[in-house]
Amino acid sequence: VNGSGKHNNWSIATDAGQNLLSPGATPYENAQFLLFLCAVIKAVDDYQDLLRISVATAGNDHRLGANEAPPAVVSIFLGDELNAVLEAIETDTPYKGAEKTQMKLGVDVLPKFNRDTTDRNRTSPFAFTGNKFEFRMLGSSNSIACANIMLNSAVAEALKIYADRLEGASDFETAL
């Protein structure tokens, strides 16, 4: 009765296969990652109405907001660590880094690993999950084509705005 949905895993890569939404190991790679991340955030913020329309059907509209489905309002979840990084940049304060906590499984024979700092809340409509976004509002009968056309076009526009600003800057590093 409540319908079902699917997750649209979305990322952006170069023609050589480099994932531009994968956080980098060096400051330069992180600057590139943050630029593309901010372009996606801007795109979703500016065009949330088109993203919402791209998944609208009678059955899906009934499903959204109920029974562990994402809400009908488009919002982004980045996870605590990435949110803290962006807040540090915004306030021009040093990023202190998230404290890595180990998972406590209660089983000694399994290897120890750190708790994931990205999204584990499966009801977030548009969530960053480590090296990609999951757009979780699509109904099971929806094609991903319309949502991807809207998302790709919106991100392309944001990247064009950023490229124009960076190409015209006298100091690239400061503008970035």
Residue ranges and their predicted role:
Residues 1-176:
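Active-site capping/gating regions of soluble enzymes
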